[in-house]
Amino acid sequence: MKRFLAVCACLLALVLLYLFLADKTGLYIDWNPGRETTSFTRVEGKTILVDGEPFEIRGVDMGVGIPGHFATDYAIDRETYLRWFGQIQEMGANCIRVYTILQDDFYEAFYEYNKDREEPLYLLHGLWVNDYVMYSHRDAFDPEYLGALIEDGRTLIDILHGNKTFSLSEDLGSGAYTRDISPWVLGYILGVEWEDTTVAYTDHMQKEKNSYQGEYLFTSEDASPFEAMLAQMGDRLISYETRKYHAQRLVAFANWPTTDPFDWEEQVSAYFRKFAKVDVEHIRSTEKFLSGQFVSYHIYPYFPDYLGFQDVLGQEVPQKYRFMENGVFNSYRAYLSMINDYHTMPVVVSEYGVPAARGRAQTDRNTGRSQGGMSEKEQAEAAVSCYEDIMKAGCAGSVLFTWQDEWFKRTWNTMAYSDLTKTPYWCDVQTNEQHFGILAFDPGKERCVSYVDGDMEEWENVPAVVEQDGLTLQALYDEAYLTLRIHKEGYRFGEDTLYVPLDVTPRSGSKTAVEQDRKPAYERQGSESAASEEGTIVPLTFERPADFLLVLDGRDNSRVLVQERYEALRAVYSHLVYAEDAYLNPPAVDATAFVPIRLMLQVPLNPGPELENFGYDIAETFDTGLLRYGNGNPSSPDYDSLADFCVNGDDIEIRLPWLLLNFSNPSEMMVHDDYYLHYGVEEMPIEGIYVGAASEKSVRKDVQMAYLPLKGWGSQPTFHERLREGYYALQRLWTEP
């Protein structure tokens, strides 16, 4: 009996050892070594073939975000995926692209959706690089970098073949993966937008590792160490899938303009800090790799616009005449053509598009396809024109970024203003990265609490906050906006000016207001200071110290101003925008100056003055406090997603984004504390704000300000899905003859 137990224990130990080695090293036993290796995808010249027929990839990127959750929560369920797959295919797309290993619900849903479908929805699957490793001290040959990529790649291959009984990871999705979805997987996009410093550091530290000779991939004599690392990773994964599953599929390595293969003019390289290259032409395939490689790039029209930069500085752009449309230089199509002409393999633009967001991070100098500040209609038009540019450049396919909005995302020019641990719980229309989706998540279970559309029905049972001088103010709020309704007897839009002071923080504010315009450095001349010498005195005083002043002054001149002490841009970016140290001479707590609310942009439209007059970056800004007139109801035929206010007779509706009012986390009603007490942005809780309203012609010049209690919703935001115009625009393009 003891011998039997000992034998059983040894067998169990061997099984456990095999399972461990299979999981950690990819060890496996091929029980059918003579089986032929097959592939339903191939490359022929610059064309992708599926089942032997030319195939244009028309795809949509799909993230993992859903309101109330971070990406690593992997909170999207099977039923949601099934619904989305149907909507995507009905749009005319034939492919989705995901970036990393997801929860098992995704693969279950993908199998369920495709198993009996004559025309399947295909998949391009990504392989993610851990953020900590990417931005750490390691080069790409470090076991924590290359080793982790290969290990995760083997796990991914097993998952796609339904052969991963259980997978558990700190950063990746987990679960039981038993569905074989490999018949519908076109290929892999390995890696991410490579960090240029990692590429350069690897090439510097590992100079002797600049070649690789594998069974399926090898490098040319011109390869860099980083490219050799990519070849090794790709070869190891192709080998694993070939030997274990006797299958192959397309392979691409992620890339973007920051590490494109070109040598740019010295001024371009210096301005955009372009110092690293990844050239996949240096990675070659052997005859054993049946599927072949394609090229993957993320390319957006607004940044980094190398060719547009050259053009605006008067530098020669080769064959510029080919890309002139109605007198406008289409630098986006010119760059796409450069990329496609350079490569010998099929080129797929695996990210393109623009966000339908109120906030902006970069303006497109040529074709108006900017990173934010775009309405949903403009987003749709940009998606179509970008797709057409990609196809005219000769690319083999495209993948739109992205399917759904992602509230957890951050943008470099607003992230200092928000609590980044709470972003999934509210909708920040100032942060453009959250709103690339053609599927929007709007606040409210079925509809928003209020729309700025001139329909006052939703205000019927809302109590008044302020009543004075024939003027009434009411307020509602949700996960995206604080919405106000002002009723004024005999209101004359365009003639009467209304003022709405708001007291958000008890730390600062002023009872009087002088409207001033702090000039950014790029608008100043000589030794002119940032503060303008003259200002417009507001003909009212406020009952309480106000931090913001809403000025309703007609269709094109209505705006929100911020008291100088509470200007977030000054506190965070003064050195880049105003060329001044914000903390050497801070504004007084009760400073009377109220200034425009601006967002910093990445690159000026015309960088010439910056290059000529300054020895450092001087940022251009975007006036985000300027209010846009229009109808903000998606059900209306004249819907404008950027509409801030609407007027109907004696009634005005205004919606104010939370971040515009310095709320860092409205889900818990947290606002910015005094910047100059903390040397930066710190939070403080509030339970409400004070708000008032008056006309410049009011008899009473001391504006009454009443208390508006505010209560957060915690980590349980409400939302409903809505397909944006971009969905229907692409559907018309892709499905109609």
Regions found by a protein language model. Name each.
Residues V465-L611, P666-S698:
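Surface-exposed, glycine/proline- and aromatic-rich loop segments on solvent-exposed faces
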Residues G454, Y481-E489, D650-W658:
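Short, well-ordered beta-strand segments enriched in hydrophobic/aromatic residues
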Residues N130-Y135, D139-D142, D152-S224, Y245-P257:
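Active-site groove signature of glycoside hydrolases
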Residues G26-D116:
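Active-site-adjacent substrate/metal-binding segments within catalytic domains
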Residues Q267, F272-N366:
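Glycoside hydrolase catalytic-domain groove-lining segments
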Residues D77-E151, T155, M233-R249, E325:
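Aromatic-lined substrate-binding rim segments of carbohydrate-active enzymes
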Residues R360-R369, G373-E378, D389-V465, L723-E725, ...:
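Aromatic-rich peripheral "rim/lid" segments of glycoside hydrolase catalytic domains that contact
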Residues A148-R154, Y201-A228, F309-E325, R360-M374:
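A solvent-exposed, charged loop/short amphipathic helix patch at secondary-structure junctions
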